[in-house]
């Protein structure tokens, strides 16, 4: 791989990371804890433990944190709780070495990690105590640019887990997925992989495990057709902070940093506007964007009385510590223009009490150049959406994409099934994702519990690599959950009848109906045509009420609990 391309002012020649002195630290607010190797390990550990005491059980709490490690070696134990992002700030993961456990533990009794959401580990290496790293997680848990110097398990003592995401990661030993229901690994490497359950998808991974779908349920895509890795913070050997923007890559395989830094370019952090919760408003943020500034959200919740508008090409918007945008007056939280190269990363969009037409709208207004978009697409990375759970929230659509060639690299779009403000008539949401643009590519699409189509895809040449969806638990009766006469419910994944070209790999759709007599006719609904192709689909009933009658259109038998039937369709058509 070529070395990382950065602006000349970002690097000082002739210095190695072994010569790093503690750099001047930017003011990123009280909830970004910055550690350097000169600090006593006990002092670092004390701060980590204080954060975990706050965040361990704070599923719907208001606090947000980023734990930031500057290049060097550390001997600490890092438990990762809710809304906590652990970051290494080296040019490669190996520039930050943690000798000790970095772990995510199950948040429910009986080792159950199915509600272990909203936490992240990015950009460092870990040598786990005892040789094995435990990462028991479910949705909205980025694991990026990591090097595990040992083994890794994706569960806690074989308790249930519903993940998950891994990208640009090297695990020297074995990855044991165990009781994970599903997983996507993109551009990652390991010594070996063991385990499978319902839907395991591997894209651009050089050493995929042996076996073929459906037993084990492995979906293997040899190369990643097009992707841009997520922007990330970096501190160079002179102590300068920058945001690195990896280059667009095509037909890639394996991690980006084998031969040095991830290829890309850097922008000095000093040129970013640093937003602060409780201080900044939509108005103050928009004023800075209008001046041509890029934007860094520090951890916290931002109450917005208007939409944040990203209109300039190549704008970077990066959130730390699950920075959360919540519209308060029924507006869209963020709207981008149809301009090439916009990058949105690391944000949680949380619906407010007044229904929003969308939470994030991509490509609004006059159409831009499709030729330029093809060469420099808009990309979304680790963008998460929530309707309800922390309180009443309402949105018609969560993520609305108009721009052609948009890349989505990991998203969870969740209408809450538990927490505060939850009910069929309380946290209302028609659709999780609506795609109108052509040539949109999505890796790691998790969409759950919305009240009509979870996904409605109207653009042509769409591609989805991994889809996980639970349809809504809580329709009170079939009449409240019917798309058309003679059709029960709304398909989870709907490709519009006008579409002529669409393809999906590795789709799992599950039901947990709480009321008797509620069913879904088909999990996936698509038009017929030579350009419509799907690979490796499964439906599962997780509760004893209702059923999914077909997997895709009229193919696939009904789900059943007794006897257990998990219908699968290998190829469509």
For the regions a language model picked out, list residue spans one by one.
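Extracellular/periplasmic carbohydrate-active domains that bind, remodel
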Residues: 18-573
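Bacterial N-terminal signal peptides
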Residues: 2-13
């Amino acid at each position: 791989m070529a070395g990382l391309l950065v602006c000349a002012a970002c690097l000082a020649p002739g210095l190695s990371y072994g010569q790093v002195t503690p750099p001047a630290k930017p003011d990123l607010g009280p909830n970004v804890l910055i550690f350097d190797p000169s600090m006593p390990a006990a002092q670092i550990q004390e701060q980590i433990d204080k954060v975990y005491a706050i965040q361990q059980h704070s599923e719907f709490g208001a606090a947000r944190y980023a734990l930031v490690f500057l290049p060097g070696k550390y001997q600490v134990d890092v438990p990762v709780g809710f809304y906590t992002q652990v970051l290494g700030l080296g040019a490669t993961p190996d520039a930050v070495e943690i000798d000790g456990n970095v772990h995510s533990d199950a948040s429910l009794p009986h080792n159950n990690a199915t509600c272990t959401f909203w936490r992240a580990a990015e950009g460092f290496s870990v040598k786990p105590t005892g040789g094995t790293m435990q990462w028991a997680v479910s949705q909205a848990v980025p694991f990026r640019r990591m090097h595990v110097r040992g083994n890794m398990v994706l569960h806690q003592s074989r308790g249930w887990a519903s993940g998950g995401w891994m990208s640009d990661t090297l695990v020297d030993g074995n990855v044991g997925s165990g009781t994970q229901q599903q997983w996507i690994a993109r551009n990652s490497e390991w010594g070996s992989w063991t385990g499978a359950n319902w839907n395991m998808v591997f894209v651009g991974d050089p050493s995929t495990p042996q076996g073929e779908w459906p037993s084990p349920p492995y979906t293997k895509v040899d190369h990643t057709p097009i992707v841009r890795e997520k922007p990330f913070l970096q501190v160079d050997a002179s102590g300068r902070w920058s945001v690195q923007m990896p280059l667009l890559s095509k037909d890639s395989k394996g991690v980006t940093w084998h031969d040095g830094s991830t290829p890309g370019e850097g922008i000095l952090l000093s040129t970013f506007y640093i937003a602060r919760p409780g201080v900044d408003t939509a108005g103050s943020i928009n004023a800075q964007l209008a001046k041509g500034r890029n934007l860094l959200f520090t951890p916290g919740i931002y109450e917005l009385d208007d939409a944040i508008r990203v209109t300039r090409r190549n704008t970077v918007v990066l959130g730390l510590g699950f920075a959360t945008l919540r519209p308060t007056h029924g507006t869209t939280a963020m709207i981008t223009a149809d301009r090439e190269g916009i990058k949105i990363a690391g944000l949680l969009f949380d619906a407010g009490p007044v229904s929003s037409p969308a939470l994030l709208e991509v490509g609004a207004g006059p159409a831009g150049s499709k030729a330029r978009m093809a060469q420099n697409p808009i990309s979304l990375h680790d963008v998460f959406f929530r309707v309800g759970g922390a309180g009443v929230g309402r949105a018609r659509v969560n993520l609305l994409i108009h721009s052609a060639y948009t890349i989505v690299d990991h998203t969870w779009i969740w209408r809450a099934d538990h927490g505060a403000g939850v009910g069929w008539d309380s946290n209302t949401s028609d659709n999780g994702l609506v795609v109108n643009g052509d040539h949109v590519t999505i890796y790691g699409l998790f969409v759950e519990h919305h009240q009509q189509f979870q996904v409605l895809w109207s653009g042509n040449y769409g591609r989805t690599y991994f889809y996980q969806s639970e349809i809504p638990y809580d329709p009170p009766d079939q009449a409240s959950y019917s798309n058309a006469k003679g059709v029960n419910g709304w398909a989870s994944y709907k490709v519009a009848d006008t579409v002529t070209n669409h393809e999906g790999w590795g789709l799992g759709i599950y039901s947990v109906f709480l009321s008797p007599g509620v069913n879904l006719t088909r999990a996936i609904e698509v038009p017929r045509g030579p350009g419509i192709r799907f690979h490796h689909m499964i439906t599962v009933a997780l509760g004893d009420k209702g059923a999914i009658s077909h997997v895709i259109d009229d193919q696939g038998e009904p789900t059943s609990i007794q006897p257990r039937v998990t219908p699968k369709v290998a190829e469509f058509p």
